[in-house]
Design a protein with these regions (language model features):
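Active-site oxyanion-binding pockets that recognize sulfate/phosphate
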Residues: 150-157, 195-199
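Aromatic- and glycine-enriched pocket-lining scaffold segments that form the walls
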Residues: 175, 181-195
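Alpha/beta catalytic barrel-like cores
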Residues: 1-152, 159, 168-169, 176, ...
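Acidic/histidine-rich catalytic cores of soluble enzymes
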Residues: 195-306
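Residue-level signal for short, function-critical loop segments
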Residues: 99, 190, 231
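Extended substrate/RNA-proximal surfaces in nucleic-acid metabolism proteins
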Residues: 168, 174, 180, 203-210
Length: 420
């Protein structure tokens, strides 16, 4: 796409939106400030660097066997760098605890330290990325029976408590060195395949474990904790300890950020509808944007109705400073760098559309009970020239606009990933 064509289309878009009282330049400036947290685990199918032959557990599954997945830290970072080069703006990288730079040593989860992630911090500093972090309470012998922080065995619980505390120390150090608050997310797979009698016991154990974890105080200037629920997983269809109600209650009672994952609810339930309620009670919200197809399948994010509804809720609530956007999917059936770029660009497009929404007029219609007018304008807004604005945003950031990035990824595959 020629630069002159992009600029010409952008000028038309500016004029068209101006007719509706919308400042396109301001919307672009706002989008420029929005960082999306890119999940490192798409690049290697959630394998990590503890044990390359280890099995992915925790009721999650990466399906597909597309060639070229990252096998080492250097390959994974190179793939992320490539994806970032095709995504406009400055963004974050989200790391799980079993992606440490262990130097060939066996380091158990309760023994991880900031030194095992110093090379990640150095890389992020060099590339101008910021980092987020996650405890990894799955794919480990001490999570094999499906329970971690809620385990009946106090010794098992203590192991995972120590792991999460160590993870929080790492997140704090990441935030300190990079000058940006690192969000540390806690998700545990705890649950049962079939009918569970002592449901209260496990939830009491989880609450007490979290209480012990948060007794270790961290600096809020460097890191923030977030807690994540789930409805069910493979092997935990009947009961999940960390339900939405559990974490919503714990988060509100203890002033903790709450993570909402698009795929962690019933297929007919959407997290966009939860944003406005949680904003009234929780200090902040972390989003793990995914695309579940019939279950929590973690398909690549696309520009669908729910993604648009999700970003609209954030912008309409004027909550950009309280809602953090991260991605969480892992499709092993397609080019993994392509999966990154498609998902992040889709999320950015949805955010841009929301920023360009004629919200003042829509609110006026709603307040006056003009429901036909509201519906009509919502529909017309869908076909406004937002895509021309996104192309301009790409151009402004020195990133390929339009579908031309496909060929760039194909070339990288030919030269790099196909040789693995």
């Amino acid at each position: 796409m020629k630069e002159s064509q992009i600029n010409q289309a952008f000028e038309y878009a500016k004029a068209r939106y101006a007719d509706l009282g919308i400042d396109v330049e301001k919307a672009v400036e706002q989008l420029e400030k929005l960082s999306i947290s890119l999940h490192c685990w798409q690049a290697d199918d959630v394998t990590g660097f503890e044990n390359g032959d280890g099995e992915l557990t925790g009721g999650i599954q990466a399906t597909g066997n597309y060639p070229g997945k990252a096998r080492t830290i250097s390959e994974l970072r190179a793939d992320i760098d490539k994806a970032m080069s095709l995504i406009p703006g400055d963004h974050r990288v989200n790391i799980h605890a079993f992606y440490g730079d262990f130097g060939g040593e066996t380091v158990d989860r309760d023994q991880i330290e900031p030194k095992h992630f110093q090379s990640w911090i150095d890389w992020a500093k060099e590339k101008n990325y910021k980092l987020d972090f996650n405890s990894t309470c799955f794919s480990h012998e001490k999570s094999a029976d499906g329970f971690t922080l809620s385990h009946r065995d106090p010794a098992i619980r203590k192991f995972w408590i120590n792991h999460v505390i160590q993870s929080r120390k790492i997140a704090e150090e990441m935030g300190r060195q990079l000058g940006s608050k690192c969000i540390h997310n806690i998700w545990v797979p705890d649950g049962s395949k079939d009918l569970t009698v002592d449901r209260l016991l496990y939830r009491k154990n989880l609450k007490e474990s979290l209480d012990q974890i948060f007794e270790y105080k961290t600096n809020d200037d460097y890191m923030l904790d977030s807690i994540e629920c789930k409805l069910f997983g493979i092997g935990s269809e009947s009961y999940v300890v960390g339900s939405h109600e559990f974490y919503m209650g714990y988060g509100v009672a203890n002033n903790k950020m709450i993570t909402l994952d698009s795929g962690h609810f019933h297929p007919t339930e959407v997290i966009s509808d939860k944003i406005s309620s949680l904003l009234l009670f929780a200090p902040e919200i972390m989003l793990h944007v995914s695309r579940g197809v019939r279950w929590d399948s973690d398909h690549v994010v696309i520009l669908n109705d729910e993604l648009q509804a999700l970003t609209q809720e954030i912008i309409r609530a004027n909550a950009l400073d309280r809602v953090h956007v991260g991605l969480d999917y892992f499709d092993a059936s397609i080019n993994r760098i392509g999966a990154y770029v498609v998902g992040v660009r889709a999320t950015q497009k949805a955010l841009l559309q929301a920023l360009l929404e004629p919200i003042a007029q829509l609110r006026a219609y709603e307040a006056n009970g003009q429901n036909f007018e509201r519906l009509a304008l919502l529909e017309e807004a869908k076909s406004l020239p937002w895509a021309a604005v996104f192309d301009y945003y790409c151009l402004k950031n020195g990133v390929i606009a339009g579908e031309a990035y496909i060929a760039d990824i194909q070339q990288y595959e030919k030269e790099v990933t196909s040789n693995r």
